[in-house]
């Protein structure tokens, strides 16, 4: 709306200039006014000439028109964030300008009052020139020799001192402070870039959803019947609210007593006020509890995820260690003694031989069983069938080392030696 108003003002001034030229030339074609508005040179124009004002307004409005293209930047994620950051920086600069203008004005008055009586330099002694000199000094675009006056020592010393203090305060302190403020604002926007961009994008979308104009630009500056209707409705509502509604309107909630008005809540509305306050307090407490629960759940979920990650790493490490141990066992393998049989196999062979050499028969005894693991290992080492293959003879069955086998063997020997004398038999028994 501001841009359209400026365009309208620029075109109005041009029309006014044409109307004035037509009027003066019609009344006095050879007059000075007609000559001024029709054929005078630009250098002869007055400062307040409408043509100057129209050109200035048109130039400023053209600049503002092109800057309006930045209004669609929030539609893009990166450009929208940059636009928001630039807006915050401009706000910081505007707030900073108040301090800067106070200090700049103070030094401007001091330097101008020192150099006014002397007129030794063209850059100092004049208010406008001194302001320009100090302004461009902040950006390092002025020479420090401007403040020199060799023939006046005291004013020169004071002028140099003020100029040095101004340089320290403005260039070193305030400009660096401004840079720090701008950096802080930019960092805040970057920290919440996603939220800021989505909010700006939503504002852009809502600006297109709202009710638009009846006529397109630039015809929307002309009043339409709808605009007249809206104006009348707004005036009618304003009058009604001021004279009728405001007198009878009741507050949405009962008053709360304060120190200035302790009896505000007393009366018939005390119960309503109390119930309203209870509802508000309950809503606030519920909101706080829900927020705390969400934060607690999020923290617990993060802790659980961290613990699961650590447990997974531990299990993976244990699996790697077990696999390494298994590989080492497989590569090493079982080692056999140099005699060809283990100690246990030699012991079993010796016991079997001792049973075979027994003379008298011995009663049957239950067979000694070897654990499956040991039997399997030893059978694999000495070449015997393990427990899963051939089973050992049970008690009462004949085997090469069982007591029944030994008894039968002894009976056969006694039958074969039946022709021996009885004394030899008795001696053999006693020897046995």
UniProtKB/Swiss-Prot annotation:
Major localisation: membrane
Region of interest (Disordered), ranges: 356-432
Key words of the record: Calcium, Calcium channel, Calcium transport, Ion channel, Ion transport, Membrane, Transmembrane, Transmembrane helix, Transport
InterPro entries tied to this protein: Ion_trans_dom, TRPC2_channel, TRPC_channel
Transmembrane portions of the chain: 1-21, 52-72, 96-116, 162-182
Membrane topology: Multi-pass membrane protein
Compositional bias ranges of the Low complexity kind: 387-404
Single GO biological process annotation from the record: regulation of cytosolic calcium ion concentration
One Pfam assignment: Ion_trans
Disulfide bonds: none
UniProt-annotated location(s): Membrane
GO CC field: cation channel complex; plasma membrane
GO MF: inositol 1,4,5 trisphosphate binding; store-operated calcium channel activity
Ion transport among keywords: yes
Function: Thought to form a receptor-activated calcium permeant cation channel.
Family: Belongs to the transient receptor (TC 1.A.4) family. STrpC subfamily. TRPC2 sub-subfamily.
Protein name as it appears in the record: Short transient receptor potential channel 2 homolog
Designated gene of the protein: TRPC2
